[in-house]
């Protein structure tokens, strides 16, 4: 098989260009406002200005990134850089911001190629081609970045560069890249325990002497803290204000649309119990659609410390497994630790957005190449996780694109897994039934709700069904995959397989 990587890059880029005129969310105005703030206001006003409700709440490296973009934007349409010009979206502005996402996806492309190379995959193998397809044509990134509008490709590109460096045992480069990533978007802090344990165990503690180990720790601290010094240094006098923007705990337990996690089921159980017991809401409703603090009617109130404690508790087993793993097996355990740390934060985190499922889905694409069990769990989560992003694309004009892109991607994913693992059909009956159950949600949303005249009486029900039903799959994946990762038999499949497409074909023919 030829190296078709750059062909896939071209196909992905063409698709992204076609989506430029598509609907975009309020996040488009968020980033336009950040362009205006960083271009028009002095540095000490960046994290203070509140002209728009969409205040700057990403770490300083992302603010510097917006400033760099603004230096180009001023030649495209300077009116987009006026702070008071709220909700401004000229055609030039739309094209500029859309193209800025596409161009910065180059970092993601480099991250994918680097990471797959670090796994030892030959560029002419079926595994390399399959992983390239799953990552470069990832439907989640297409939904979130190139329709909804964000810059996740840039961020996940840096993450993949860090992972690739770690697997190649370029520990300091990995630590540096991950520290840079944290200063672009602090949500990746939830993956930091996996990186920290790996670097401590397989870099610092692998040194020949105590002196060398101490030296390794010092190097890591210098390399890791330097990006923070460069990032936050100019804001030292305003550090409390910056941190209050980065960690706004008054936003409430869940977002307006419940991310498909444990708290979605918790909220649903509270609503059900309140209905059965005929208890009236004692505060802001969890289904009000507003970003605010809420009170549960029946179940105990949840506070940020509770969510942090649960997140840390559920990260602990895989981190212990990583620390105790043999060096030869450590890259595989590390990748699973990254996935499960990300999933722990998604399942139990405070005010989690549905988009955060990408922190689990994208690293999991790397693990689909390991063996059938990883692939099986990845597919189940993919069905639920990518479907849970549909509420981001609520405009009626997007129904056909969202369903066609989703169905094409999951079909492509199944086809590639079948080629890597001939005879791949390893789903349990309940898994099949669960995945097929997703067809009922659009059937209700687009047909039954109108036939039964429920579209006006219960307009929120499709969102509720999407959130709760997807949450069942996410929690199933989290529990089942966690148990699998902790009890894995390491002798079955190496992390890097040399199986070529020709070998796969021979194997299939001899069955």
Curated annotation (Swiss-Prot):
According to its UniProt record, in which pathway does this protein act? Protein modification; protein glycosylation
Q: Return one GO MF term.
A: dolichyl pyrophosphate Glc1Man9GlcNAc2 alpha-1,3-glucosyltransferase activity
Q: Which gene encodes it?
A: xit
What is this enzyme's EC?
2.4.1.265
- What topology does it adopt in the membrane? Multi-pass membrane protein
Mind telling me which residue stretches traverse the membrane in this protein? 4-24, 94-112, 124-144, 151-171, 210-230, 300-320, 332-352, 356-370, 377-394, 432-452, 469-491
UniProt enzyme class: transferase
Per the record, what is one GO cellular component? Answer: endoplasmic reticulum membrane
Q: Keywords in UniProt for this one?
A: Endoplasmic reticulum, Glycosyltransferase, Membrane, Transferase, Transmembrane, Transmembrane helix
Q: Which PANTHER family match?
A: DOLICHYL GLYCOSYLTRANSFERASE (PTHR12413), DOLICHYL PYROPHOSPHATE GLC1MAN9GLCNAC2 ALPHA-1,3-GLUCOSYLTRANSFERASE-RELATED (PTHR12413:SF2)
Q: Which organism is it from?
A: Drosophila melanogaster (Fruit fly)
By what name is this protein known? Probable dolichyl pyrophosphate Glc1Man9GlcNAc2 alpha-1,3-glucosyltransferase
**Pfam families for the chain:** Alg6_Alg8 (PF03155)
